[in-house]
Amino acid sequence: MGKLLALLAAIAVVLAACSSGGDDAAIADAPEPEEGPANEPEGEFEFNLPTGAVIDFGTAPVSPEGDLSPENQAALELITSTDIDELPFTNEQIEAIGFLGESGDPRLAWVFSDILRFTRDAGRAVALGDASNALLGDEFNGSDWGALTDRLLAWDIPAPPGYIDAKRAIYSSILSEWEPFFEPNGIVDWRFVSWGGVRIDDQPYNDTPGTTCNCIPAVDNPEVMTVAQANEGDWLTPDTVIFGVEINGEARAYPRQIMEVREMVNDTLGGRDFGMPYCTLCGSAQVWFTDNLPEGIERPILRTSGLLTRSNKVMYELNTNSVFDTFLGNALTGPLLEAGIQLEQHTVVTSSWGAWSEEHPDTTVLVEELALGRDFDFRANRDADGPIFPIGDVDPRLDVQEDVLGIIREDGTPIAFHVNSAIGALQAGQTISVDGINIVLSGDGIRAIDDDGNDIVGHQSFWFAWSQFNEDTDLWPEV
């Protein structure tokens, strides 16, 4: 762990590791579906969507197919079979990096990216940068991990043969607790996985003070208070942003300030157990039920791994070391993959405390102490200039950090509703109905219901995240 702490100090930046139905009672006043084209609401509200920039990464190099040559394989093993944090690399290892850079195989640049992520030695960084430029071209700084990885993502460069073994060697040399994640039978695309800047959260269940690990500390079964108790203090103001959850008639508010610190909650509400990850990097709070699973499967306890996939936090299950897709809720490695575990999602509403507590007067809310005295306000600070981790090519229909409410239709096709446009249209008296999905105000946020007023599961996120995990998504309103 000492190596990782040194890396954290050197980097000196606080990072966040980055269907339909439901249990809520039906909403009685479901709007009637509007007539005419669903994506062209009538009324006075003027839609003005902030579109994104198209980034020209140039022409992708051609990658070969098949196995690595014996010489390239030997060089690859040489640069990954030692302690990656050992400073400096030997001359033989530096020569091996140069040799791979002249191989003409762009697939090897993924390994350069992985090593560069943990590199503090200037000589090694230069060697990796020169080799990356030799493989991919000179139009960028090959020693810049972000610039290199953005191109690999945008170009969809294939991974080299045996990539999982090389990546396991690199990451486990930094933190041994990551090694079980690199399971050969898993379904992770390891190209997309990178270090989020923190170590793994392996706090025991129900022992989560948050002060005992150099990690993003989850909280289990958090202490809560009533609206009356909350209003006695001055911590929560009417404008405080919260994530609202209502299950079987029981409501709870999770202040964003706390979720920016904790990023993971394991809780019970309305008789249902669930895990609630919040990815600060992709603006996404989600609820995944962790009960009603197949016989023999114990309740999953979700934690933050310290890793990211395309700037989305990678969560894992504490007792089985099974990696989960945080955005999609399915197990990707380990015993829970073997069991075919797909968690059921529940709606989360982003609202202000004032509007949520007025609409849900019996709601509870997490207590201030869970924020550990921290107030990151990432949106106004760290993330004010856009994503801080590589995301590759993006869908330019919206700016990358515009909020959308993402929903998967019954036929499996995705659609995203631009949040600000939807709120503006609804406040102007318009109705929004697309394929039986009706968007309504909730607190001062939005949620989706069907034509009978039943909840349709959805969650909010930044556009770049939703559109990358759902590449063929529709967008409302149409651009």
Where are these regions (language model features)?
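Sec-dependent signal peptide recognition
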Residues: 2-10
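C-terminal motif of bacterial Sec signal peptides marking the signal peptidase cleavage site
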Residues: 15-17
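Bacterial lipoprotein signal-peptidase II cleavage site
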Residues: 19-28
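Mid-to-C-terminal functional-domain signal that highlights helix-capping/loop sites
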Residues: 27-95, 105-479
